Amino acid sequence: MDTVLNNINQSRYFNDSTANTKIEEIKKHLDSPSDADKLESMKKLIAMLSKGRDVSEAFPQVVKNVIVKNLEIKKLVYMYLVHYAESQNDSALLSINTIQKSLNDQSQVIRASALRVMSSIRVIDIIEVIILAIEKSVKDTSPFVRKAAAFAIAKVHKLDCDKQEPLIDLLEILLNDTSTMVLGAAIVAFNELCPQRFDLLHQHYRKICQLLADFDEWSQVIVLDILTKYARSQFRCPDSTMNDKNIKQFKKKSKSFYSDEEDQEDDEPENSLYKKKPLERDMFDSSEEIDMDHRLLLKSTLPLLQSRNNAVVMAVSSLYFYCAPSIEAQKVGKSLVRILRSGPEVQYITLTNISTMVTLRPSMFEPHLSEFFIHSSDPEYSIKLKLEILTRLATPENIGKILKEFKEYVKNEDKKFVAATIQAIGSCASTVPDVTESCIYGLMSLLSNQSTVVVAESVIVLKRLLQLNATNEKLEKLEKEKEKEKDVKENQSTISKHSSSNNSIKYDNIILHLSKLLDTLQVPSARASIVWVIGEYCYRVPLVAPDVFRKLVKSFSDEHESVKLETLNLGSKLYVQFTDNNSTTTTDNSIPNEFKNERTKEKITLMFQYVLNLAKFDQNYDIRDNSRMLKHFYFNTENTQSINSNIKQIVINQKPIPTETSISEDRQRFTLGSLSHIVNHTALGYTALPDFPDVAPDPSVREPIQRWIPNQQSQQQQHQQQQLNNIFVDTPFYSDEEEEDEEEYDEEEEEEEYEEQNEYEDFFGEEKKNKKKNRKQQNYDEDEYNQDIDDGEYDGEGEVQAEDEDDFDELFGITNDDNNQTANGIGGGGSGEEEMDKFDFENYINSTTKSVKKILLKPTISGGLSIDYCFIRIRDNEEFSCQPRYNIIQLNIKNQSDETFTDISIINKNLIDGADISEFDPIESIEPNQAIQKQIYVLFNSTSQSCKFEISFNKGNFPVTLTPIIGELLIPIVPIYESISQWKDEFEEVGEFKQVDDQFEFGDQCLDKLNNNNNNNNNNNNESGDENIGLMPILPIVLEGINLIPIASNKLKSKIQFASKTLLKDENIYVQIQLLKQQPPTVNCIIRSNDQVVSALLLKKLKDVLQK
């Protein structure tokens, strides 16, 4: 009851009064300190947004509320940001810093929502930042966040397909997850990212099958579709006849509709197998030889037929239809019939799929025939599909039941429904020849109906049935003659009996009845059908056909085009019958006496010539062409003998058996359940099912990787020992330490919220409030503290104090007069502020003027020409040899072959907007083993998009790619001041900076440098210079990887600060590296800049350099 009242209360936000609320009033409430006012305003905004109103005006106020603690407000803010992320890219980017910080929030809901918002911002410039966030989220402890990371991978791939390879690496991590929530989302991302990479699924196939029932229902739909394609490509066809349309499948015993035995095999008597055809026995036995993994798939998906989600039931049905043996595919029929009772949309989709299934395997739905009977409430589309299904299910055993139902349908007042039923009757008569005669006479009774629509449809169907019956008579006579030659008396009697039943149809009475309808029936298609029937069987009614032709000639000019064409054909056939006295009719060997009447022959000839002359001037070109052709056949003076000898074979020939075309048969080319199958044409993104392989691939690829499992006995012993230890340790339920941690966390959250609030107020032009922010102090355990004291790295009196982390004090190590805290970590200077000294950078900047060399063109690809390159670094005060923002790249071109290469140049540049390459002058020739250096100037205009071009020479053109390196998109700022305090004043003029930071351990390369340095210091009795203390041993590694310049450091060189600026946007960047612990060596990296994209990329680059 409370939920209902709450929903009613929430609906008030969508009424007209709320939707017309002024934006200014909402903006005022969003700036209110009350969470209740903010929540009310956000609900109004979302309601207005959902009704199509533009509320982007409130964006600045909404963004500021990202930092609030209230979870419901944050959810609404994120919903707002997702909506405007794509249409207002610049505005959405304003919140990227806060969203990044939310990725570290304690709440899993906030972390997942932040990632969802970030991945929804479709700006390619921040794609690297999004990928970094995904890399962090895939390793999150919460499955809810990892699930959001999986969906974010799919979004990033849609934004930039070039990032597929790194995204696949992240996807592999998620596929190894054991949480069904994450695994289902990962497979959905797999379907968007690389649906053909089945090699990624081999190791996880059995796990997916076993956990399939635990996935969420919408993930199950995607997973079932992928497993269907996987089974079709990895397993052999379980039934060699499953694609044969003309073979009836084995029929299972009919059970009650709501049966609990749906997932069990029916027990049949042992003597039931002898009743089956040999083909059906093979089909039944083939299921026993199915692959074990194939059997696991079928067994795991069968329970999903009872899912409440209709899409899941449809996906399982599609899987069984395409991948299961024919005998087992019949199990899905009952479930599909069950979901027919859902809404009209579901009913249409289900009936469309059933109509396609029935064309191939009618036995799947024969036990449920009555479920397809039409109800008075069925819509028109449902009626047509049900009638088609009923005709496909018609057999000699149930045709009586179906025709009895059709008899009631033709009495309906809806004439379109009756016309569709008449078509279904004709289809049943074609499928079951035994009822053709009764159907024909039943349709004859409908010719007296008052509705022209019913009469016209009856005539059209009668035409088809008469043609079909006449064709069957000819085939039976030919078969009878063959049997006579073989003297098989039993077969002769059977055929004669069947022929006599068919010959009982009185064509003359039917044609006579149809001819009378021409005087009243005005439907063109029906009139054309009657004329065709009279012309086709004119030898049966030699007196009626000429009179009908006479009436049609009189009204020829007023007839429809289709009737005119059939009139010409009728005249042609009558002329041939009356003029060819030596010929025989189609079915009789004797010529009727009426065709020998000369007077009638003369009248037919005159009427035929008259109608040919009328058709000669008709507006329709088909009628004109037909009249000229017939006139050339019958009244041509040249070569008359050669034409007359074949005229009868042309005009009066044996017609093929009429075939019915159905849209369901045309839909067979598309996969069941797909959008293309419904609309009957290839929709965007459709991929067809692969064919079964002739030889199954190696099944060993699906063997899971063996993991180390500890000894069970040792595990039990450890568990028992742990229980004994817990008995003697008296630990309170909530320890004091945990309570202190919670209090500290709450204080930190309040301080960060206040800090970010001030930041947004400054950003949007509000009054700046000069208040310092205090952060959580960094505490280290007692062992690490004692270790640091023993190593002689603390100068204090036994008390380690935390560092004041004000924006600039944290960067430069300078504190205010009222703060007595010292920097924490190696190099802390006791009580008082930590002094920073100017760094002597000249010895380092000169040694890193070039970056590490990289390969641009391999000689194995180009036939002997190798090209590697490196970035030429410049300082801020150096003059550019080209335009600003360009990188200088030095190419080392070498001929490693035995022949001379000529005309080496750069062609076919493929660059993004704003990018440019100033190529070198063409090289006329380069001798074997000769090396040449060239410089090019490149403007990348992006931190992630590559520059693509081709190297051309006499061997051909070879595509190459220059990728921007974030460490080379910087220019060091050369200090020109004498003291650090002057630098601080200079930096303060720029404004407040945004910051990204991370703590991590050193990699092997840096550890080796530090260890070697410590060993050397011990051997030299600690008398080495400054270059061997603190972070100095790894400084060359940092400068080699990133184009920075060191500005200042503390005395122990455990904290070093760098400065640089971006090449593209000319934004200052400040970097600090601080050594925190020695065991294990841990470093803290801080990067501050207004360019958040570069900051995030630079932090990742710095982390990669230090963790090598």
From Swiss-Prot:
Keywords: Endosome, Membrane, Protein transport, Repeat, Transport. GO terms for cellular component: AP-3 adaptor complex; endosome membrane. SUPFAM superfamilies: ARM repeat. The keyword GTP-binding does not apply. HEAT repeats lie at residues 90-127, 327-363, 397-433, 434-471. InterPro entries: AP3_beta, AP3B_C, AP_beta, ARM-like, ARM-type_fold, Clathrin/coatomer_adapt-like_N. It holds the Pfam family AP3B1_C. It comes from the Eukaryota. It is found in: Endosome membrane. Residues 480-501, 736-797, 811-835 are annotated as: Disordered. Residues 736-764, 780-797 have a biased composition (Acidic residues). One of its GO terms (biological process) is intracellular protein transport. Residues 480-490 have a biased composition (Basic and acidic residues). The keyword Membrane applies. Its main location: membrane. Adaptor protein complex 3 (AP-3) is a heterotetramer composed of two large adaptins (delta-type subunit and beta-type subunit), a medium adaptin (mu-type subunit) and a small adaptin (sigma-type subunit). Part of the AP-3 complex, an adaptor-related complex which is essential for the compartmentalization of the endocytic pathway. Belongs to the adaptor complexes large subunit family. This is AP-3 complex subunit beta. The lineage of its organism: Eukaryota, Amoebozoa, Evosea, Eumycetozoa, Dictyostelia.
